Regions:
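Extracellular/virion structural assembly segments
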Residues: 1-168
Length: 168
């Protein structure tokens, strides 16, 4: 994934979008985009299954709601030297993972993901994620670092660029 395709924004990046490739030498591994663009699961609606009636009755307004989802995908950092690999890794952890709350977006060709409807117009948005864990997959003399990141997306219906409310 070359420059201009994967972006992060956190309080440690001065709330500005940062190009992952330019800043950290980071790219998504094969299969990562498929994991990221997979639709969120739906919540089970509130229902009542009475023995005296056929079928199941669902309470109005309780169906069609998205559930929290977990995203796990592989990334890698490619650096010119071992020292540059360590520097990029530490900078990524400090700027993107340490704040825990992360916004992420992808631009694949000219198509942004995610998008949302803004007054009927499809508009580029952002995934609002909470960092959960990082599992090291492998390294080659610190020039090529590969690992798996896991995030929670608490509310997949929020895809606009505003700051979501987080409970205190």
């Amino acid at each position: 994934m070359p420059q201009g395709q994967l972006f992060f924004k956190t309080k440690n990046t001065s709330k500005q979008w940062v190009d992952a490739y330019t800043e950290y030498g980071m790219s998504l591994e094969d299969g990562a985009i498929g994991e990221i663009i997979t639709p969120a699961p739906m919540k089970e609606g509130v229902s009542n299954s009475l023995a005296t009636a056929d079928g199941v009755a669902y309470m109005a307004g309780t169906i069609g709601k998205k559930n929290e989802r977990t995203l796990s995908f592989n990334i890698h950092i490619l650096a010119a030297t071992e020292a540059a690999g360590w520097t990029a890794y530490r900078k990524f952890c400090r700027e993107v993972l340490d704040p825990q709350y992360v916004q992420m977006k992808i631009v694949d060709g000219t198509e942004p993901f995610p998008t949302y409807l803004n007054n009927g117009v499809e508009t580029a948005g952002a995934l609002h994620l909470l960092f959960r864990s990082c599992q090291q997959v492998g390294r080659y003399r610190m020039r090529l670092l590969k690992w798996t990141l896991t995030f929670a997306e608490p509310n997949p219906s929020v895809r606009d660029n505003r700051e979501p409310s987080i409970m205190n």
